A protein has these predicted regions:
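Active-site neighborhoods and metal-handling regions in enzymes and metal-associated proteins
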Residues: 1-201
């Protein structure tokens, strides 16, 4: 998943976003085929299903990664509560992500919080979760360090990291959040400005 696409984004909706695929990320999708799974498919977006929009912007050659959830009509309470849990995980990791904190410890904290929320089985992919919760971002979309299992990299001031906690519900869809942060002496400062709320149209 490293050094593949300079600019990128995908939109997936409902159960199609929750299908396993060859993706190295937490979401899958049917898309147009097995080699372009994280892409728009041919099904129409339905009411009351989550629409996940994951996209990258570039400013002066530096990338910023973010994900938002949209819906045509209100989502089920289960999905809304899971989305709120992912926001809480993101915000907690940003608060704890100070210089010297080891990336693997942040990953474990995210897993523990997902477990406490009753979402461990679906956290960061289903049926096989990916072993990370975030990644460096800069001139490339995916850079070091990785906030992942067994990663022992201490955070340093100035590192720029995308945190992306997500939950995959088979036959229902994907909810979660992603924002880009920069490590400061007191924690991670968020760079993206678009609201984290589910946007219901």
């Amino acid at each position: 998943g490293f050094n593949q696409l300079p600019l990128y984004g995908h939109i997936m909706a409902g159960r199609n976003a929750a299908l396993p695929s060859n993706s190295a990320g937490p979401t899958g999708g049917r898309g147009l085929g097995p080699f372009l799974s994280q892409s728009a498919g041919t099904d129409k977006i339905q009411k009351n299903e989550p629409i996940i929009v994951d996209y990258v912007a570039s400013v002066e050659a530096y990338n910023s990664d973010q994900t938002r959830i949209f819906a045509l009509g209100k989502l089920k309470d289960e999905l809304v509560k899971a989305h709120e849990a992912m926001r809480t995980i993101q915000n907690t990791l940003a608060e704890k992500g100070q210089p010297g904190v080891v990336t693997g410890d942040l990953y474990q904290l995210a897993l523990d919080m997902a477990q406490s929320a009753g979402l461990a089985e679906n956290f960061m992919g289903y049926p096989v979760p990916v072993p990370f919760i975030g990644h460096g971002v800069g001139l490339e979309l995916n850079e070091w360090p990785v906030i992942g299992r067994n990663m022992r990299v201490p955070l340093e001031v100035g590192m720029t990291i995308a945190l992306e906690p997500k939950v995959v519900f088979p036959d229902k869809g994907v909810v979660g959040i992603e924002n880009t942060f920069v490590v400061t002496p007191t924690g991670m400062e968020r760079l993206n400005r678009f609201p984290d709320d589910i946007i219901v149209c």
